[in-house]
Amino acid sequence: MKTLPEDFRTYTQALMGEKLYQRLEHAILEEEAPTSIRINPFKCKDADGEPIPWCPETGRYLSTRPGFTFDPLLHAGLYYVQEASSMFVDMAIRQYVKEPVMMLDLCAAPGGKSTAVRAALPEGSLLFSNEPMRTRSQILAENVQKFGHPDMIVTNNYPRDYKKSKLQFDVILTDVPCSGEGMFRKDEGAIGEWSTQNVNNCWQLQREIVSDIWNCLKPGGILIYSTCTFNAHEDEENVEWICEELGAEVMALEGVEDAWNITRNLTGTDFPVYRFIPGVSRGEGLFMAILKKEGEWEAGSPAKENRKDKKKKDKKVAKGKGPEIPDGWLKADTEWMPAESNETVYAIPGRWKDIYDQAEKNLKVLHAGVKLGTDKGKGLIPDQALALSTMLNKDHFPQVELSYDDAIRYLRKEAVNLPADTPKGYVLVTYRQVPIGWEKNIGNRANNLYPQEWKIKSSHVTGELFIVNS
């Protein structure tokens, strides 16, 4: 049975008041968390379920929790399983970002907020998704590749590395590491890890993170500060510190309805903040504040701001002088520039090539644009990320539609037999007409090219699911 730390109970009850705290404690100890998903609008038309009021275009509450692992469309990136409170960032982006920007999600793993942000940003924006921890950065890269949008760059760096890079952003999301009080309901381990010392360590680390990244935010730019914890040390007190020490103004969101039961400032100060409390609002614990940096923001396309001499760019991609993008692999409505790193070939949207070059020079880039494949000297082997990209020209490749059972076998990286008349070479395999990966047909058998590290490890199967409409 769950028990909450006494120091947590005493402090949080004093902060929230008896009535609010009792609702929180009952939810943590007795209630099930609601199940919710967010659809990928670049791949998916709609989904069953009840719209989430602060993210109505893409967020859905589900009445039950299905076995998501066994839905091939989850692995194809048509939707993402995300708790509802975290989708509040969608409302912040849509309200404060009205034209193309360059944005950084600084602490982005596993990728839920990054993909939510990318869906909400205006077309023509570029999003950097960063994760400082190496193992978590791999999960971030996987989820970004499944999402499939080309205007994203994934990095594995600390804030100080970004400071040195000289890259400048219009918007920065800092979903900072925290004491995790908002996760107590769904993760009992978070309860065991909690301590007052950890809270103290966290609020100090959070200030260091924001301070390190502050110079990367343009004058007049927007900083979205969020945690998944309740205490004021990591929440209101840090927001107040950012305003006083770094020079920022806290901004309010319009249209936040009383019926959503979002709790406001608990410290008696008058600046607007947004706190989701389990048992009160319909989601897990989240705190968010929107801050504007002092100064005048200059509007303009981030691509134009970072463009260099076009002749230099053309010279870089001359035929026979580096990697090339195979004809027909990508949709032709975008200008693509090739890039290569450790035998991996990428297609970078031309408007971002100079920014990509700056990032590649100064940061550890894990993914950018469209990851086409690896070149081992015998031609390009198409990558899983290409199969899942929204820029894939799928009609260029031979395709085989898989049954549900075969799709699950494929995602387990088991052998899947192809029809006898399937052409030799690389074959795009689909499920419900949605690409899920590649096989290499060599005649008497086919090699499953699904990434080993992505495969479904469970042998259990729940049966075919119909959660979203492709």
Where are the predicted features?
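Polybasic, low-complexity RNA-engagement segments
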Residues: 1-45, 63, 294-470
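Class I SAM-dependent transferase core
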Residues: 56-95, 140, 451
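Conserved class I S-adenosyl-L-methionine
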Residues: 99-109
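Conserved SAM-binding loop of SAM-dependent methyltransferases across substrates and taxa
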Residues: 110-123
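Helix-to-beta-strand junctions that scaffold the AdoMet/dcAdoMet cofactor pocket
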Residues: 122, 217-219
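S-adenosyl-L-methionine
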Residues: 130-167, 174
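Class I S-adenosyl-L-methionine
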Residues: 169, 222-225, 230-354
